[in-house]
Amino acid sequence: MALVTVSRSPPASGHSTPVGPTQDRVVRRRGRLQRRQSFAVLRGAVLGLQDGGDSNVASEADSEPMEEPSGEEQPTEDQTDKGQGLQSPWKQVQKRHLHLMVELLRPQDDIRLAAQLEAARPPRLRYLLVVSTGEELSEEAILLGVDFPDSSSHSCTLGLVLPLWSDTQVYLDGDGGFSVTSGGQSRIFKPVSIQTMWATLQVLHQACEVALGSGLVPGGSALAWATYYQEKLNSDQGCLNEWMAMSDLESFRPPNAEPGQASEQEKMEQAILAELWQVLDTSDLDSVTSKEIRQALELRLGCPLQQYRDFIDNQMLLLMAQQDRASRIFPHLYLGSEWNAANLEELQKNRVSHILNMAREIDNFFPERFTYYNVRVWDEESAQLLPHWKETHRFIEDARAQGTRVLVHCKMGVSRSAATVLAYAMKQYGWDLEQALIHVQELRPIVRPNHGFLRQLRTYQGILTASRQSHVWEQKVGVVSPEEPLAPEVSTPLPPLPPEPGGSGEVMVMGLEGSQETPKEELGLRPRINLRGVMRSISLLEPSESESTPEAGGLPEVFSSDEEPLHPFSQLSRAKGGQRVRKGPWPALKSRQSVVALHSAALVASRTRAFQEQGQGQEQSEPGMSSTPRLRKVMRQASVDDSREEDKA
């Protein structure tokens, strides 16, 4: 492990040094900006260390802010501990990358951790940064993703910005990877080693606990500084796609080939795919076999295709599934499956410009061609779709306003996407749930939202009804609601759409309660491992301190009777402005039972101590009385109880 110190100074200014009352504020500001940050460099990770007062040294020479003491190196250069001997190549590379990543930050922000991640396309390098700000004693943190074209590159780009809100959860995904979910966004990361993973999870756990204790929620002034980095996103589309990748996808878009670097295998697969359409169109699918399809392709291409048998079978199934076209529910809205979302020709033919992906396990196949909106949920009754329906309605309306069309899809186009289309119809056209379900099932008979989604649709129907009634009442009294009106924009029913070619002419209308059971789209997943639970289990393995019965006067301050109720952040104190400041190291989490027991013991001891003091005070004021302190304490408690009974009576 090596120690690296980076000197960070703001740009030189031509203004003179202020004098008078404002000088102290300027010096303090320079002390925050002109400082050095030290890092512990590990293989694959860089840990930020706490400043040990370097800011005071930097703020002393306020008349010459850019001047460095003799014997020290210039700003933005590093100083290693003992500074002797040749360093290994990986340390030199990490130090150079560290300098480049520091240059991406604002002067008041610090890197708490820089962890190297696995890259899907070497020689690219990826780093995950945990960045905190020094503004006003704030403990807010964000995650940044940094991309390097290769290890020798002298520049880097920003590909990810993820604020850490109070709802942040970290899950272990196996094989050294983990996912971070915050503010409705989920991102996956896979460090290059176990040591790097362990260092990263420790820093993430601390940042998540601070965010939870500070109550950081979207929509307020918290983490407003993250917009600075969101405006600086400049990685190429390939890097952005890698940061957006999901760990549990079952359907992937094909890899983006580098310009001019398509392999011979990819060229052959493209040729097979082009001919496969023609072969299937001219074959009797009820009698033809896979071997006969391959032999027909060999005749067309003039070469053996033994090594492409699995590719041909896979593409053949894909093409057959894509023959089930998406259902046109409204003139501007199609409802379909993942096969429809992967069929570029059909999407272009239907003039689709927006794709609403309601599946957790399906990737965005053409992010460079279409506008996507993702709602990452599973087809489970416990999944919550209702909070997303306002944004999905707005997304669909954006496509309609542009004169284009939107495809709403999930895995099979049966449950998640169908429920979202039903919610859209109820809000847009003022229909109730039964009317919307009849219309959608007429055009796509396989629609079957699960029971949990049906309950949410009924709740949504009540919300829309109440909103419309409230809107009408406000119009009667002449009050304009500041909220977005939920009244339908179009109240007239749509003309019936012609049935899709090749579709069934039967109308299958199912009741809400009597819908037939259909096979689930996905099997249930086993519970995910949460980082907070892992850290709690680790803390319980630590040897506990010797617990002896404390005396009344020797109780620790954390268990004082006048303190607020205990919470997991007992070492976070309130600073100016109501913000929390962390003091000292993070304590190990104790079991809830022991904390409750100790708190109860402390409360009893403190009350006993208070009774003793009151008893001693009365004994001094009434020296003629000969009762003992113990007897006096019992009598006082009895009198208090009697007075309470009299009050109740």
UniProtKB/Swiss-Prot annotation:
GO terms for molecular function: actin binding; protein serine/threonine phosphatase activity; protein tyrosine phosphatase activity. Its EC number is 3.1.3.16, 3.1.3.48. The modification Phosphoserine is found at residues 9, 38, 88. GO terms for cellular component: cytoplasm; cytoskeleton; nucleus. Tyrosine phosphatase activity has not been demonstrated for this protein to date. PANTHER family: PROTEIN PHOSPHATASE SLINGSHOT HOMOLOG 3, SLINGSHOT PROTEIN PHOSPHATASE HOMOLOG. This is Protein phosphatase Slingshot homolog 3.
